[in-house]
Amino acid sequence: MGCDGRVSGLLRRNLQPTLTYWSVFFSFGLCIAFLGPTLLDLRCQTHSSLPQISWVFLSQQLCLLLGSALGGVFKRTLAQSLWALFTSSLAISLVFAVIPFCRDVKVLALVMALAGLAMGCIDTVANMQLVRMYQKDSAVFLQVLHFFVGFGALLSPLIADPFLSEANCLPANSTANTTSRGHLFHVSRVLGQHHVDAKPWSNQTLPGLTPKDGSGTRVSYAFWIMALINLPVPMAVLMLLSKERLPTCCPQRRPLLLSADELALETQPPEKEDASSLPPKFQSHPGHEDLFSCCQRKNLRGAPYSFFAIHITAALVLFMTDGLTGAYSAFVYSYAVEKPLSVGHKVAGYLPSLFWGFITLGRLLSIPISSRMKPATMVFINVVGVVVTFLVLLIFSYNVVFLFVGTASLGLFLSSTFPSMLAYTEDSLQYKGCATTVLVTGAGVGEMVLQMLVGSIFQAQGSYSFLVCGVIFGCLAFTFYILLLFFHRMHPGLPSVPTQDRSIGMENSESYQR
């Protein structure tokens, strides 16, 4: 009860910035899930081949990773962070508005690269601001943050669905199976098997399509609707920024991010309160910079090996789990329509929505659970659940019912892994390392690499390899998590004093002492 009261008190003191950071992650979610269902329409719009349109995915993921790594540049002050979030969320609305006018695949790839940069910046900055505000109490707020990702990712396919073209924009003399709307590798693999003597249309550029086909114009409405829905988000950031810049008339006002720490200080003995009057620390946190600054910090020279091992193993866990999230959502449709399941294309189209829907539900359920369960326990349950679910799917690979149940189960188990791992790692390192930047970067790399790797294996080995990859990557995630627990036990930074005292002590020590 006391913990819940403290958390609710923290939320009341930081309500506006917290709601703003949550809404910014809604923009992130909107932008992360719309490419899959709109792929065929965008391909028709740009008159491009499958290998050409695949660069759109790559450009978004690569720039998302780059934006995550460089996001720390904008975290040095609160004003920089808010300006970065305002620019990024506004850029996402502009991207949605501009996509219908991209008639060339290179232009579309460039636009999606801009979206990726904005998403990466949002990912790093919003996560870090919440961790910086709430520190040891950040687990609950991170769960809500990532709930908004799932909500946005669930909403964007639902918005796009009524506007997707049912017509086939392929040449009339093509005998290709065009019903596999969602995925590049599925179509190219099927065509490669069934049309050995013919040149597959996946390597051909579509002939010019006249505007009469409407394949580009109908889906344009979906993008414009998403642009309008997202528009209040940059406005909310601008309101918070203007509120932060008001104190020209009242210089006594302190930064918004300080209130959570003031509340923590109120529970300390008087001598500790007097010793920690360091508000500038919260304007520029030395422990939370961009990836390159973290790697070059001189005050990490004395850190024990376990300090670096915790960073690496935690990032590897998220490399696997976030990579599985991206790969499963991208290829579950292709797996379902293939033999032995041969699910109807319309029915299979519900699988990605089911997956993201249960991710959203899982993040919603994790909000109250995270206030009563340790982040380490939640991550353990999640990773074990992922492995068990993939094993069940592999054993019952001929059963469509198990595919739908397993998809929902995977969504639940993967939903809270990232925020729980972030809260656990930051607390293990006493908020002194570069955990947020490293973990966000590791998750971004995993989402990009595993999606490409699973797609290549799927194309070469067949649909059964999809579940085998899931089992392997799930087991690797579990192995890395066990190693993380081991290094956490070995870490000399584990004090016997309460966590609350640690959150204060970390302000007075910027480097490890051997």
Curated annotation (Swiss-Prot):
Gene Ontology cellular component terms for the protein in this record = membrane
Q: Which GO terms describe its molecular function?
A: transmembrane transporter activity
Instruction: Report the transmembrane regions from the record.
Output: 19-39, 53-73, 82-102, 107-127, 139-159, 221-241, 307-327, 347-367, 376-396, 400-420, 438-458, 466-486
InterPro entries for this protein: MFS (IPR011701), MFS_trans_sf (IPR036259)
Q: Which cysteines are joined by disulfide bonds?
A: none
Source organism, top-level taxon: Eukaryota
Q: Which residues are glycosylated?
A: 177, 203
Name the major location.
Answer: membrane
Q: How does it sit in the membrane?
A: Multi-pass membrane protein
Location in or out of the cell: Membrane
Keywords (A to Z) from UniProt? Glycoprotein, Membrane, Transmembrane, Transmembrane helix, Transport
Q: Which family, according to UniProt?
A: Belongs to the major facilitator superfamily.
Q: What's the protein here called?
A: Major facilitator superfamily domain-containing protein 4A
Protein source organism: Pongo abelii
Lineage start: Eukaryota, Metazoa, Chordata, Craniata, Vertebrata
